[in-house]
Regions:
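Short, Lys/Arg-rich, polar N-terminal cytosolic tail immediately upstream
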Residues: 1-11
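N-terminal signal-anchor transmembrane alpha helix
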Residues: 15-54
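Conserved histidines in hydrophobic membrane contexts and catalytic metal-binding motifs
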Residues: 33, 97-98, 140
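Interfacial helix-loop-helix junctions of multi-pass membrane proteins
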Residues: 36-47, 141-154
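Long, glycine/tryptophan/cysteine-rich extracytoplasmic
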Residues: 47-77
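Individual transmembrane alpha-helix segments
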Residues: 69-109
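Membrane-interfacial alpha-helical segments at the cytosolic side of multi-pass membrane proteins
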Residues: 103-120, 133
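Membrane-interfacial loop-to-transmembrane alpha-helix junctions, especially the N-terminal start
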Residues: 124-134
Length: 154
């Protein structure tokens, strides 16, 4: 009988654990993304600030400013006209969690990947595959940004 291939037989344990954590985070992201889509929350954050965007509105004035900005876009005018600030907070926080989780996945993937490259833990074909996954993750983020931008203009 031949032995079945199992990734943990060939990868260092640290790499296997890291990839399993990233995989679990992606599964959670799919669920959060689905809820974001079903609640039509994706366009509630009308600006994209990759660095400073991690900080949500903190004061009542911040929330009012974010809501006023949202009211300027077609989604509010056609779908959510009459929405209250409290309702807006709900959809905003859904999209906020979606974006923050995406950034966190990027960090959890990229930082250990750099560490594994520096230490020589991953090299050869595996290194290229992991770099490809990093590029696919970046492309997914870019597609999300394009989807939001196009939704804000139509």
């Amino acid at each position: 009988m031949t032995a079945r291939f199992h990734p943990s037989n060939t990868l260092p344990r640290s790499v296997t654990i890291w990839l399993c954590i990233v995989m679990a985070m992606i599964v959670i992201m799919v669920m959060v993304g689905g809820v974001t889509r079903l609640t039509q929350s994706g366009l509630s954050m009308v600006d994209w600030r990759p660095i400073m965007g991690i900080i949500p509105p903190l004061t009542q004035l911040d929330w009012q400013d974010a809501f006023a900005a949202y009211k300027q876009f077609p989604e509010y005018k056609t779908l959510n006209y009459g929405m209250t600030l409290s309702e807006f907070k709900g959809i905003f926080l859904m999209e906020y969690s979606h974006r923050v989780w995406g950034r966190l996945i990027g960090l959890v993937f990229m930082v250990p990947l750099m560490w594994f490259f520096i230490r020589g833990t991953v090299c050869g074909p595996l290194a290229w595959k992991l770099l490809g996954l990093l590029l696919l993750g970046a492309a997914q983020g870019a597609m999300g940004w394009i989807m939001v931008k196009s939704g804000l203009s139509d």
